[in-house]
Structure formats: C-alpha cells, structure tokens
Amino acid sequence: MVPGLFQVEGYARALIANEPGTTSDQAEERLAARLDRQRLLDRPGPQMMWVVLDEGVLHRPVGGPEVMVEQMRRLLELAESPRVSLQVLPYVAYGTVGLLGSFVVAEMPGEAPPVAYIDSLSTEDRVSDRSEEVKSLICRHGVIRADALSRRESLGLIKEMMRRWTT
C-alpha cells in the first residue's frame, strides 16, 4: 500500500473502510488521524524522506480508477519536493524484504535515537523506539533502495501508470 503519509483521502478511506471488523465510526476516526498526520509533510525544516513503493501499489485499484489517478498525481507532486526521494521497487526485483508493510524511520538532529513509525491495517499504526527494531528497519530500507528503480525511472513509471488509470 501507499504509505499513510502519502495517501489521498479516497485511497485511505477505501483501505480503512474495508478492514474486517471495523465499524464506520472507527474507520472515520482512523481516517481522520491518518489525514491529520499528513500535516507533518508541511512542516518547515530540512527533514528528508526516502520512500520506496512496491510496484504492485501502482497497479492495485484501491478505491477505483478515479482514486488511483488522484493517488498517482499526489505521488508525483510529493516526488517533486526537494525533501522527498521516491523510488519504486519493481516486480522483477529479487528480494521480498519490502513486502512486509510500510514504515518510516525518523532520525532526529542531535543525540536523540531514531524512531520508527509502522503503518498497519490489521492493528493500530504504531511508533517504536526499540533499538533492535529500528536498526532492523534501517537495514531493510537500505536493501530495498538498492533493489529499487532510480528516481527518474520511478517517476516515469508513476506517470505511465497515471496515463493507464485515465484510459
């Protein structure tokens, strides 16, 4: 799935509303919280985000074609930011380390240890500061980036998928 920080409302709504056992009130609360967290992207400062998407998320019709066009457009907008590095892990990549779900590792300036934010549909999204877990996620991210398409190739693929979703 597209990481929660990058999801448009229709995409997030489709994912959350279809989770078994979730009431409509729970879905609305989770949706509001997810969209509220996206304000982090608007904060001033030098934060940098490195994002790797599995190619499958570009093909899977979450919310339908209109939502997918909007989602592709959002990914392209974010990728144009000097603070975002966006890559796609292609189907042909050998490794499966990136198929375990989305996560964000935040490294703070100064002495503070890094923390991880882990997206989950089956449980509440969570933040971890457990050293072993964060180190494992940092290592996993390095492996995923090495197997991913270049930034230019990734943007080209997202543009192509946006064209496909519009036809």
Please describe what each predicted stretch is.
Residues 1-167:
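Hydrophobic protein-protein interaction segments
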